[in-house]
Amino acid sequence: MRELLEKIAAEGEVVADGVLKVDRFLNHQVDPHLMKRIGEEFAAQFHRERPTKVLTLESSGISPALMAAYELGVPLVVARKRRPLTMTSEVYCAEVYSFTKKETNEIIVSRPLLDSSDRVLIIDDFLANGQAALGMVEVVRQAGADVVGIGIVIEKAFQDGGRLLRSQGFRVVSLARIASLSDGVIRFHEEVMS
């Protein structure tokens, strides 16, 4: 997605080896026009799979996932990292390790929100090692539902997450694929391939 690549190139910042900061448009301050375009692109990519729900993990995945759900005309389910007092029903849960934050979180979804009739599209902001996506896959499987695809805004293609998910048979669509963040330079996958 050209518009996203341009935004990453202009406003993304490599803050450490393997860490890309995009908080000016994706996960701290959000560019609503870009999120709308991202939602449209995910809807175009996945509408044939007929998802009945979009699932994301709080909090950075919410903006692109909401726009994708809106464009697809389906509800958005947000997996929580902490169980709020208002979540009184039984839950589906999975453990997810964050390499960025160096911590393990239990993600939870209230059982009434997913069931075996659902066709779930997973959307997330980043894909690095694949742990967040695999945690969401586990939650969907616990519900007896089907994962119809995984949409990623930015994939760190130099890490194993994309290969891991694709090797398990998931259709993964990444709108931007980063080949390298070495030496503080953002290199897109297409640049390396050509």
Swiss-Prot record:
Pathway membership, UniProt: Purine metabolism; XMP biosynthesis via salvage pathway; XMP from xanthine: step 1/1
EC number(s) reported in the record: 2.4.2.22
Keyword Glycosyltransferase: yes
Example GO biological process: xanthine metabolic process
Top-level taxon of the source organism: Bacteria
Catalytic activity: XMP + diphosphate = xanthine + 5-phospho-alpha-D-ribose 1-diphosphate
Name of the protein: Xanthine phosphoribosyltransferase
Species this chain originates from: Geobacillus thermodenitrificans (strain NG80-2)
Taxonomic classification: Bacteria, Bacillati, Bacillota, Bacilli, Bacillales
Gene it is expressed from: xpt
